[in-house]
């Protein structure tokens, strides 16, 4: 059987072959990013941040490094600062996880082990740490999840220090924790 479309003859056999090729191409397109693209991009951004420093991290360089189209990351990060905020959130979550492991009845041990974990994170992830505590993100309150992650980490440090400290004065605790945080 043959169809004619504006002087273009196509046999039914050719249509079947063409359809199979299209299905194969379509399935490849759909499976190109079979996972969570945002997570893959964020993991890549963290690696790039550590390798090159956050000042070299851009949405364009992230797309290139991740082997995705230049527009793909923009679906998840509208601006460079949005990307920085997401990297910083991951950093604060990692610090919080590291320092939260220590929850014994010995407040001195908790403080020492938590401080070691905090310092270890900073040394191992120096560029991410610089991003988290630097000036690249102008206003943490613009990013509620970033503010929450940073605050959760700070409050854990504060609570651990308060348990350890013999001086329970709130102003003393706050000033001491700001020194620890910095």
PLM feature spans:
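Hydrophobic alpha-helical connector segments
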Residues: 86, 100-127, 152, 176-180
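Amphipathic alpha-helical segments used for helix-helix packing
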Residues: 124-141
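Alpha-helical DNA-contacting segments of helix-turn-helix folds
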Residues: 40, 49, 83-91, 98-99, ...
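N-terminal positioning helix adjacent to the helix-turn-helix/winged-helix DNA-binding module
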Residues: 37, 41-44, 91, 176
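Amphipathic alpha-helical packing segments from all-alpha helical-bundle domains
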Residues: 16, 100, 141-166, 174-178
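N-terminal intrinsically disordered/low-complexity leader segments
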Residues: 1-36, 47
């Amino acid at each position: 059987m043959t169809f004619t479309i504006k002087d273009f003859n196509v046999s039914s056999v050719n249509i079947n072959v063409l359809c199979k090729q299209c299905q194969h191409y379509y399935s490849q397109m759909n499976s190109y990013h079979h996972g969570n693209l945002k997570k893959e991009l964020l993991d890549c951004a963290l690696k790039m941040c550590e390798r090159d420093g956050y000042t070299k991290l851009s949405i364009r360089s992230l797309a290139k490094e991740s082997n995705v189209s230049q527009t793909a990351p923009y679906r998840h990060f509208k601006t460079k600062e949005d990307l920085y905020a997401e990297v910083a959130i991951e950093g604060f979550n990692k610090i919080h996880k590291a320092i939260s492991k220590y929850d014994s009845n010995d407040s001195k041990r908790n403080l020492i082990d938590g401080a070691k974990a905090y310092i270890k994170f900073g040394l191992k992830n120096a560029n991410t740490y610089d991003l988290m505590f630097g000036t690249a993100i102008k206003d943490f309150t613009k990013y509620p999840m970033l503010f929450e992650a940073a605050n959760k980490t700070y409050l854990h440090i504060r609570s651990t220090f308060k348990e350890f400290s013999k001086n329970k004065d709130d102003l003393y605790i706050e000033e001491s924790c700001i020194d620890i945080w910095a």
